């Protein structure tokens, strides 16, 4: 498996879309990561849509929704996530 490095600045402000349904979930506001290793843990979503709110995901201390980075399938013009891995 090829490991690809992703920088937080490359995904901030990109729209988050469901791989399965094409539904828009919101916009990447920031990422949560481990400082020592640089491992990305979660995408922090701002401007959440009703579709994202319906998934009852974990939220941070500011009430922003967290999408585990393990659910991210691809990053390009959009951040594509597997909705099946969120429920």
Describe the function of each predicted region.
Residues 1-87:
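Peripheral interaction segments used for macromolecular assembly
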């Amino acid at each position: 498996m090829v490991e690809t490095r992703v920088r937080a600045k490359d995904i901030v402000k990109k729209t988050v879309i469901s791989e399965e349904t094409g539904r828009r979930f919101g916009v990447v506001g920031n990422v949560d990561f481990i400082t020592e290793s640089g491992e990305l843990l979660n995408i922090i979503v701002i401007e959440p849509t009703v579709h994202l709110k319906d998934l009852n995901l974990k939220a941070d201390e500011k009430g922003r929704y967290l999408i585990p980075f393990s659910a991210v399938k691809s990053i390009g013009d959009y951040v594509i996530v597997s909705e099946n891995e969120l429920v």
